């Protein structure tokens, strides 16, 4: 445990907490302060100026990261007949209907995303209490309730991520791996910010993007200049 603490302290010492870095600089620092023992995930935490208790300020959506996530995403598809065949051909990891529902009711949640055809949603509703809290419940707003299951599978496998603000007005998302080039991480970060700006609730007053932090798995947080909202991969000084 002391080795972990020492490694963390050494990593944290590289980050100036009083500075706000450009997205490119932050990505470079997040990589530099990541574990050398494995390919760490790079995540972004964003504090939004919204009140999630108000339905019209519950920010949620999806975005296709231009450089993917670097993660092998396990996808479940609730479908039958030709739709099930299409899902399998598109590369879905698990495809089925009632048998998958029963498996989930038994405690199985070994997957990262779930897609369903509209006719399956009555059945999927039986496991809403399991899938919902984990962010796995199919939803038309995120494109995961659809008749075009092949497209949905391909998008998720290709780097499409879902995001949702929590009760404390924070939003967390994966933007890549430490093995990514920092410009690719900055581009992925920019795609997320652009989408958040696009769907900003009209009822949200004051500053919308209030605070941004990048970090690797178990690494220190790197403050990002939240006012930078274009040219995310530019190599400019903060």
UniProtKB/Swiss-Prot annotation:
SUPFAM superfamilies: Ribosomal protein L1 (SSF56808)
Stored InterPro entries: Ribosom_uL1_bac-type, Ribosomal_uL1, Ribosomal_uL1-like, Ribosomal_uL1/biogenesis, Ribosomal_uL1_3-a/b-sand, Ribosomal_uL1_CS
Gene Ontology terms: cellular component: large ribosomal subunit
Function noted in UniProt: Binds directly to 23S rRNA. The L1 stalk is quite mobile in the ribosome, and is involved in E site tRNA release.
Protein family according to the UniProt entry: Belongs to the universal ribosomal protein uL1 family.
Protein name according to UniProt: Large ribosomal subunit protein uL1
Organism: Corynebacterium urealyticum (strain ATCC 43042 / DSM 7109)
Subunit structure: Part of the 50S ribosomal subunit.
The UniProt record lists the keyword Zinc: no
GO biological process, one term: translation
GO molecular function, one term: rRNA binding
Region listing for Disordered, in residue ranges: 217-238
Record key words, sorted: Repressor, Ribonucleoprotein, Ribosomal protein, RNA-binding, rRNA-binding, Translation regulation, tRNA-binding
HAMAP family: Ribosomal_uL1_B
Annotated Gene3D superfamilies: 3.30.190.20, 3.40.50.790
Alphabetical list of NCBIfam families matching this protein: rplA_bact
């Amino acid at each position: 445990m002391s080795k972990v603490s020492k490694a963390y302290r050494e990593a944290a010492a590289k980050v100036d907490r009083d500075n706000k870095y450009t997205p490119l600089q932050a990505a470079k620092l997040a990589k530099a302060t990541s574990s050398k023992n494995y390919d760490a995930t790079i995540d972004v935490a964003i504090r939004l100026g919204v009140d999630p208790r108000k339905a019209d300020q519950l920010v949620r959506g999806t975005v296709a990261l231009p450089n993917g996530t670097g993660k092998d995403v396990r996808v479940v598809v609730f479908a039958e007949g030709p739709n099930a065949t299409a899902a399998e051909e598109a590369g879905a990891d698990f495809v089925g209907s009632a048998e998958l529902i029963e498996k989930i009711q038994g405690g199985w949640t070994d997957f990262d995303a779930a897609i369903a055809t509209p006719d399956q949603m009555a059945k999927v509703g039986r496991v809403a209490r399991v899938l919902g809290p984990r962010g796995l419940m199919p939803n038309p707003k995120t494109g995961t309730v659809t008749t075009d299951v092949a497209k949905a599978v391909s998008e998720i496998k290709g780097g499409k991520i879902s995001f949702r603000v929590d009760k404390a007005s924070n939003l967390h998302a994966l933007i890549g791996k430490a093995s990514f080039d920092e410009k690719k991480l900055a581009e992925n970060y920019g795609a997320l910010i652009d989408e958040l700006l696009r769907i900003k609730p009209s009822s949200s007053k004051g500053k919308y993007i209030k605070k941004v932090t990048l970090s690797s798995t178990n690494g220190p947080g790197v403050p990002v200049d939240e006012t930078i909202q274009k040219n995310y991969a530019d190599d400019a000084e903060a």
